[in-house]
């Protein structure tokens, strides 16, 4: 399947929203210059400690036809809103964060996204939300662009598996699931399993 990743930036009201927005723009610029714009969509909504913003962002990326999500911490993000976005989005999600570009502006230019990334991963676990986090999820715009591109085959596999239906060979009674196959992980991946019965046409 084709994958289109919606990139949503998040922020806190104790940090400049513009910092997160500008870092999102830098990420998108770095990505499109290296990989093109076909597989990504820049969501104009920046989530700033608001579940209203979260709903707006969710509706926007759905309307844009996105089937994968990237939550981008341009600075210290809001744990509740950003993780709820991943929860309510019907598709694979990843989390990455912006590194500090310089040490010269630690008042208006300090985002502390590294700390926000730690809190995000903790809150994802608390809510039992599955999301992809790269091994080194904090980086420059160029590094985050590479992470975003590396997420595409992962997202494609998840999207493809979510629509998969396995028809195995019987015959067995209708709706009969035995313990002779490791099917739990398939069910957790939202894969349906069916067996044709002796009564099937």
Model-identified regions with their sequence ranges:
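Short beta-strand elements in bilobed, periplasmic/extracellular small-molecule ligand-binding domains
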Residues: 28-47, 130-136, 194
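Cofactor- and metal-binding active-site motifs of prokaryotic enzymes
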Residues: 47-162, 174
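Single conserved hydrophobic/aromatic residue that forms the stacking wall/gate
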Residues: 191-201
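Glycine- and acidic-residue-enriched helix-capping/strand-helix junction motifs
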Residues: 12-27, 107-114, 174-180
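Short beta-strand segments enriched in small/hydrophobic residues
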Residues: 1-21, 163-172
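Short, solvent-exposed amphipathic alpha-helical segments in soluble enzyme
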Residues: 22-25, 85-88, 181-189
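Conserved anion/nucleotide-ligand pocket segment
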Residues: 7, 153-180, 184
């Amino acid at each position: 399947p084709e994958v289109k990743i919606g990139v949503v930036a998040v922020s806190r009201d104790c940090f400049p929203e513009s910092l997160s927005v500008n870092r999102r723009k830098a990420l998108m610029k770095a990505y499109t210059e290296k990989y093109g714009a076909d597989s990504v969509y820049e969501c104009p909504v920046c989530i700033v400690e608001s579940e209203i913003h979260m709903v707006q962002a969710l509706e926007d990326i759905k309307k844009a036809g996105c089937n994968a999500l990237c939550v981008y911490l341009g600075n210290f993000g809001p744990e509740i809103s950003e993780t709820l976005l991943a929860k309510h989005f019907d598709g694979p999600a990843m989390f990455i964060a912006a590194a500090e570009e310089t040490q010269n502006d630690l008042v208006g230019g300090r985002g502390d996204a590294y700390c926000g990334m730690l809190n995000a991963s903790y809150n994802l676990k608390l809510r039992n939300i599955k999301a992809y986090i790269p091994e080194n999820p904090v980086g420059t715009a160029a590094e985050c662009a590479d992470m975003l591109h590396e997420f595409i085959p992962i997202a494609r596999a998840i999207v493809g598996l979510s629509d998969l239906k396995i028809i195995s060979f019987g015959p067995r009674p209708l709706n009969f699931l035995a313990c002779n196959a490791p099917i739990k992980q398939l069910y957790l991946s939202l894969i349906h399993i069916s067996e044709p019965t002796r009564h099937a046409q």
